[in-house]
C-alpha cells in the first residue's frame, strides 16, 4: 500500500484512554503468563494503531503546513499525547509490578523493563501543560522553517 492510500482517522481520545485503562486492569488480573502475554500484545497493537495515526497526521502536515485540516490534527496530537502518556503510566506500573515480569523479560528482554523504569522517572502528570506547550511551540517553529 502506498502512503498516499493510507486512510487517516482521528481516534476518539476517551475511547483510547478507556481501552488502555481496561487493558491495564486486565493485565493486573491476569492469572497466568499466557493471559498476560495476550493482553500485552493487545496493548502493543493498540499502541501501534495510535502511533500510526499520529505519524500519518504529522507527515501529511509536514508536506503542507498550511493545510488547515492537518494543522488541526497536529494540534490535536500535540494536546492528546501528553494526556495519553499519563494513562500509559498506569500500564507501565502494571507491567513493572506484574508477577510475570520474569517471563516477560525472558521473552522480550530486560530492555522492556529498563525502558519502563525510565519512562516512570521522566514523566509526571503535573508537566502535561508544559509538554503540550512544548509541542505547540515545536509546531510553530516547524511552520517557520517551512
For each feature predicted by the language model, list its residue ranges.
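A well-structured
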Residues: 2-146
Amino acid at each position: 500500500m502506498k502512503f498516499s492510500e493510507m486512510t487517516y482517522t482521528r481516534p476518539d481520545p476517551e475511547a483510547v484512554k478507556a481501552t488502555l485503562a481496561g487493558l491495564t486492569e486486565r493485565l493486573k488480573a491476569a492469572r497466568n503468563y499466557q493471559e498476560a502475554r495476550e493482553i500485552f500484545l493487545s496493548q502493543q497493537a493498540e499502541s501501534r494503531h495510535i502511533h500510526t495515526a499520529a505519524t500519518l497526521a504529522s507527515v501529511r502536515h509536514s508536506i503542507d503546513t498550511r493545510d488547515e485540516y492537518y494543522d488541526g490534527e497536529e494540534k490535536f496530537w500535540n494536546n492528546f499525547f501528553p494526556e495519553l502518556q499519563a494513562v500509559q503510566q498506569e500500564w507501565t506500573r502494571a507491567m513493572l509490578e506484574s508477577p510475570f515480569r520474569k517471563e516477560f523479560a525472558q521473552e522480550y528482554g530486560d530492555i522492556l523493563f529498563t525502558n519502563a523504569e525510565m519512562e516512570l522517572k521522566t514523566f509526571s502528570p503535573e508537566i502535561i501543560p508544559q509538554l503540550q506547550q512544548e509541542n505547540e511551540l515545536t509546531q510553530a517553529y516547524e511552520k517557520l522553517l517551512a
